[in-house]
Amino acid sequence: MSAVAEAPLPIQMTDAAANKVKNLITEEENPELKLRVYITGGGCSGFQYGFTFDEKINEGDTVVEKSGVTMVIDPMSLQYLVGGSVDYTEGLEGSRFTVTNPNASTTCGCGSSFSI
């Protein structure tokens, strides 16, 4: 009997992030929604993380599923996010999705932008 090893996911989603996305999708009353994570130019460090809901999975997108929630990342953004993790935090500074990114060499003080 041979076992097939599962390839590690290129990016992780924490339980907190999956639970928040599930709650937001329920509020929107559209079970087709997926969390799209992307990178754009901007911010004080050069690149910014972006989060939006999308009903589509585009050709070439990487799909990560956790607890019934789907996260999609386009190929261009994925190259900057490999090995990272998407989380959801609540604190004195507010609540937000965050990315732990081992590829970032520097980040800004608020953590919303980074450079490589």
Curated annotation (Swiss-Prot):
Cell inner membrane in keyword set: no
Source species, domain of life: Bacteria
Short name of any one Pfam family annotated for the protein: Fe-S_biosyn
An annotated GO BP: iron-sulfur cluster assembly
PANTHER family assigned: IRON-SULFUR CLUSTER ASSEMBLY 2 HOMOLOG, MITOCHONDRIAL (PTHR43011:SF1)
Task of the protein: Required for insertion of 4Fe-4S clusters for at least IspG.
Name of this protein: Iron-sulfur cluster insertion protein ErpA
Origin species: Aeromonas salmonicida (strain A449)
Gene encoding the protein: erpA
